[in-house]
Amino acid sequence: MGAIISAIAGLFELGALGGLAVDAAVNTAEIEAFIGELVLQDFSVAEIFDAIETSGIPLANTAVPVAELQQTAATSGLIGQALSAPSLIAASVKAFAGDPVAAGNNMALQVWRDQMDILFPGAEWFSNAVHNINPLAWAQSLYEQVGQSIWNYMTGNIGQAVIHQIEERTTALIVYQSRGIYDILARALETARWTLTTAAVDTYQTLKSYYGELPAVSGRVEAFRRYHEVAQGRSFFEDSDIQDVLEGKKAQKRIEGPQEMTGQTIEQQTPPGGAMQRHANDWLLPLILGLYGDLTPEWRYQLKERLNVPKRKRKLPTTSAGTSPPSKRRYRGVRRKVRSR
């Protein structure tokens, strides 16, 4: 009902703007609708005019010229439907509801669109996607079409570039941190206190102190004392003597105290020249240079000798020129040149 009222109001507005009467507009609408039906039924122009005259619709009351009616009947026959708002919306929806897959296929059966990627990347897709945007829901369709393309571009090109940059930065950071660790280790070796020790002497000293601190076995001491009493008729070791020996060892241990120094400490020299530059001993220099990736000439020469060892050539047996190899033919003795028959 609301659509009918809006259509009647639209007719009154058209009549007021164009200077037409309401009945003329109504008659014109009837004629256009009638012509549209005849055109859809494949009638010719003469048959359409004959049908209009026989139907009793007065042409004099209409403001549409006969030539315009002929053009309308010959071309579309749907002027009334095309001028209405619902028909415009339906036509636009039909025009814009194309298949995006078919729009991208530039085949002979499809509408040809020139390549537009020479302007900027993605121009061809955008020109094809414009025809697939729904005017009734343009925001949602635009977001779906353009947003998906942007996401594909970011995950494809930009994503790979970002991943490549992250890998490069991570590798550079690892190399920088490793160099920093090597530098800290080299500086710690330069400022450390070095002590010269001998492992064999320390081992024997440890064993001597260990066995010296063991408690005396009463059974062995008693047996040793009885052996000497029987052999010499008197005791060489009294209980008081044994106790004095044990107490003397304990007193000596208290006086000496724990051994703090386990070797000879190497004296640390001050930087020469007074400029406080970095310095190291000669025996420590190859280790520090190796941490920084440099090699001393002696070390480089030794590595070169170990890596470039020539392969041993196979020795073939050689024979002297004067001696000939022995013949394997057996000796048959001396024969005459002329034989008798």
From Swiss-Prot:
Residues 317-326 have a biased composition (Polar residues). Changing residue 221 to G: In strain: Isolate MCFL87. Transmembrane segments: none annotated. GO terms for molecular function: DNA binding; structural molecule activity. Keywords: Capsid protein, DNA-binding, Host endoplasmic reticulum, Host membrane, Host nucleus, Late protein, Lipoprotein, Membrane, Myristate, Viral penetration into host nucleus, Virion, Virus entry into host cell. GO terms for biological process: symbiont entry into host cell; viral penetration into host nucleus. Changing residue 205 to H: In strain: Isolate MCFL87. Residues 302-341 are annotated as: DNA-binding. One of its GO terms (cellular component) is host cell endoplasmic reticulum membrane. Belongs to the polyomaviruses capsid protein VP2 family. This is Minor capsid protein VP2. It comes from Budgerigar fledgling disease virus. The lineage of its organism: Viruses, Monodnaviria, Shotokuvirae, Cossaviricota, Papovaviricetes.
